[in-house]
Curated annotation (Swiss-Prot):
The keyword Protease does not apply. Keywords: Ribonucleoprotein, Ribosomal protein, RNA-binding, rRNA-binding, tRNA-binding. This is Large ribosomal subunit protein uL16. InterPro entries: Ribosomal_uL16 (IPR047873), Ribosomal_uL16_bact-type (IPR000114), Ribosomal_uL16_CS (IPR020798), Ribosomal_uL16_dom (IPR016180), Ribosomal_uL16_sf (IPR036920). The gene is rplP. Binds 23S rRNA and is also seen to make contacts with the A and possibly P site tRNAs. GO terms for cellular component: cytosolic large ribosomal subunit. Belongs to the universal ribosomal protein uL16 family. Gene3D superfamilies: Ribosomal protein L10e/L16. HAMAP family: Ribosomal_uL16 (MF_01342). The lineage of its organism: Bacteria, Pseudomonadati, Aquificota, Aquificia, Aquificales. It comes from Aquifex aeolicus (strain VF5). GO terms for biological process: translation.
Length: 142
């Protein structure tokens, strides 16, 4: 099941800019390990779900996973082979706006080798470079 808002105030939003670094959500809050973004991007609801499934499958039982981002920005798309103009396209889905330094996922309850393997699998599902951070480690190397 994909994450998305229950209600949106506006069906269509402007794209906005992706400037600066993440000053909120850049520290570990729940788990022992975290996946931190090193670049800026829109992460779609499908990508978030793919990473969640990959983490849950690779971490096995006894582990807990937290999703620290939420896709709350609607994005639009025009149909294929449609001429330019004619207004903005229809809403296609939702994205989470991610800036460098943002913690995307957290997990706990596994040894470091298992965490590293799970991170490698999860990182391949994301469109941006990410790094694994541990609790107590300096997290501002982005």
């Amino acid at each position: 099941m994909y994450l998305q808002p229950k209600k949106v105030r506006w069906r269509k939003q402007r794209r906005g800019t992706l400037k600066g670094k993440a000053f909120r959500g850049n520290k570990l809050a729940f788990g022992e390990y975290g996946i931190q973004a090193l670049d800026r991007a829109w992460i779609t609801q499908q990508q978030i779900e793919a990473v969640r499934v990959a983490l849950v499958r690779s971490l096995k039982k006894g582990a807990k996973v937290w999703i620290r981002i939420f896709p709350d920005k609607p994005y639009t798309k025009k149909p294929n082979e449609v001429r330019m103009g004619g207004g903005k396209g229809d809403p296609e889905g939702f994205v989470a706006v991610v800036k460098p330094g943002r913690i995307l996922f957290e997990f706990t309850g596994v040894p470091e080798e298992v965490a590293q393997e799970a991170f490698t699998i999860a990182a391949s599902k994301l469109p941006i470079p990410v790094r694994l951070v541990k609790y107590g480690e300096f997290t501002f190397k982005y």
